[in-house]
A protein has these predicted regions:
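Low-complexity, glycine/proline-biased repetitive segments and flexible coils/loops
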Residues: 1-330
Length: 330
């Protein structure tokens, strides 16, 4: 009789060529007075154009059996009586995308710098603050504001693909456009900036790619989850919209599989001979991903034969089961 034993075959020694898209959480929209849109989360990728006009970054070369950090940044908060907050950073191994800057709020208040900069708040008198900067190769600056007692218009939040629009007389600035990516096999635009509020007239629209719209009468629209879109500005003391959460997308060859720690929310898909993992939430900043692979094997499994009968008219024992195949997944 043979006892069954567990066994393990380690992955190959060669490095794993890995594409990535890492987007941080978007900044919250302003919500006191003269409110501006939040900036989009920072946008870094090896599979196409990065944010802020940056080129594609180098692919990562990773190893089997090593735990790599993965974190999805939350969107920035917003309220009706305070300036919003910046979005949180997203991380994959050595790649960190910076959270989007909060939109300005109250008289002449500047937006925050971030992955993309928040828009500048307006005022009845004075001059507009300088535009809040985005992070190089991640996102663009927010827009400036138009000053006027009953004609003000705040600045839109910057997007990964374009600056936030400046406010104009009774017109809130639009959020900057996001950037399209085909890393999952289809084109999706993410990381648009949040639209701004205005005294009357026309609020700023959210930038393409999940930016929230501003308002001239009510609350701002939140940035879309898992796009890193900036939050739209609220009117007067109405709350601005929260920033959209970020996302981390990992693309590896079809023979490589990812194993995530328990606090990771992830979906998987395949496209063009690759396995694609879209991480949409992490419960802590200590979550990890480890890579394994399929090991090609040829196998033959034969069971023991049955014993023959031991009395009159007895029959012979049956042969054991027989199975063979290849490409066993480990």
């Amino acid at each position: 009789m043979f006892a069954a034993k567990n066994f393990f075959l380690a992955g190959g020694a060669a490095g794993i060529t890995t594409d990535f898209l890492v987007i941080a959480g978007g900044g919250g929209g302003g919500g006191i007075a003269y409110n501006a849109g939040g900036g989009a989360g920072g946008y870094r990728t090896s599979a196409g154009t990065s944010g802020g006009g940056g080129s594609a970054e180098a692919q990562l070369t990773l190893s089997y059996g090593i735990a790599y950090t993965v974190t999805v940044g939350a969107g920035g908060t917003a309220s009706g009586n305070a300036k919003g907050t910046n979005g949180s950073d997203s991380v994959f191994n050595t790649i960190t995308s910076v959270g989007g800057g909060a939109g300005g709020a109250n008289s002449n208040n500047a937006g925050n710098s971030g992955g993309s900069g928040g828009g500048a708040a307006a005022a009845g008198t004075g001059s507009s603050p300088a535009a809040a900067a985005g992070t190089a190769n991640q996102g663009y600056a927010g827009g400036t504001s138009f000053i006027g007692a009953s004609t003000w218009g705040a600045g839109g939040g910057g997007g990964a693909g374009a600056v936030g629009a400046n406010g104009a007389s009774t017109v809130g600035g639009n959020g900057g456009a996001g950037v399209a990516s085909t890393i999952t096999g289809s084109s999706v635009t993410r990381a648009g900036g949040g639209g701004a509020a205005a005294a009357s007239g026309t609020p700023g629209s959210g930038g393409s790619g999940g930016g929230g719209a501003g308002s001239i009468s009510s609350t701002g629209t939140a940035g879309t989850a898992n796009t890193g879109g900036g939050g739209g500005a609220g009117f007067s003391t109405n709350s601005g919209g929260a920033g959209g959460s970020g996302i981390v997308i990992i693309k590896v060859p079809s023979t490589v599989y990812a194993v995530f720690s328990s606090g990771v929310t992830v979906t998987s898909s395949t496209s063009g001979g690759s396995n694609i993992y879209s991480v949409t939430a992490t419960s802590t900043t200590s979550e990890t991903v480890t890579f394994t692979n399929i090991v090609p094997l040829e196998y033959l499994v034969v069971a023991g034969g049955g014993g023959g009968g031991g009395s009159f008219y007895a029959g012979g024992g049956a042969a054991g089961g027989f199975r063979t195949g290849s490409l066993l997944s480990i």
